[in-house]
Amino acid sequence: LLLGQFIAKCILPVWYKEIKIDGCDSCAILIDTFGQVQMRKLAALMTIMIRTAYQTAGVQLPVETVDLIVNKSLENLRVIDCCNNDQLHLSLYALEDELLSDEKIALLAIDNILAYYWQMRREKRILGMDQYARSLVRIIRARISQFCNMTVYTRWDESMSQNETPVTSLNSPKRTDLLEEMGVNYRLQLCKSFIVREFICRVQSINDTKQIRYTISDSGIKWIL
């Protein structure tokens, strides 16, 4: 859901006929490693964001106009489907030419960067999820990051599979060192809260760790600041 909000904000327009939509009017590339991207859900999220913007401005918007904005914005999104580790690597290497030819591409999103970890663990004896993720992030940093404003990827938490508590993992020196080594600016870990209908986002940078509460609704994630 959060990844969808990043994409929606990126590809929606900043303004539409004097109404502030609060998008970025940029292009995004989504690498789908699981084949689970649902464009219908992304379109529904964008629809709610547009309607909310118009309601805030006190303006009624015809359904046809909403659909027009959504469909036009979706033209700014390219989805790349991958089926295995080789295809993922080829896609990352091929993106450099595309980014050079289109300056509007501001976001690269990958869901999920660890999709083929188990395949590579069997074939090449890669032991750790962090080790595998690090190899892909190196490619992104070397060939893509200089042309793209933001790279966002989802991943499983290795500590969760080892029955470690998320808080311990998040605040550990090992995790902080890993952020610095991989060149990751922020690590977001989403988890449930003890409060009904509330969730917690743990945000870690190299120098700081904090928690932000949030709720989930049809309009996406709402931060409780």
PLM regions: where:
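Conserved nucleotide-binding/hydrolysis micro-motifs of P-loop NTPases
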Residues: 34-38, 83-88, 114-115, 157-161, ...
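Phosphate-binding/switch loop-helix module in NTP-utilizing enzymes
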Residues: 79-146
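Short, well-ordered secondary-structure micro-motifs
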Residues: 41, 89-90, 119-121, 162-166, ...
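Conserved AAA+ ATPase "sensor/coupling" helix adjacent to the nucleotide-binding pocket
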Residues: 44-49, 98, 204-207
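Conserved catalytic network of the ASCE P-loop NTPase/AAA+ motor domain
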Residues: 14-23, 69-72, 98-102, 142-147, ...
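Phosphate-binding/switch region of NTP-binding enzymes
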Residues: 130-134, 138-225
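Loop/turn-to-beta-strand initiation segments
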Residues: 27, 75-76, 103-107, 145-155
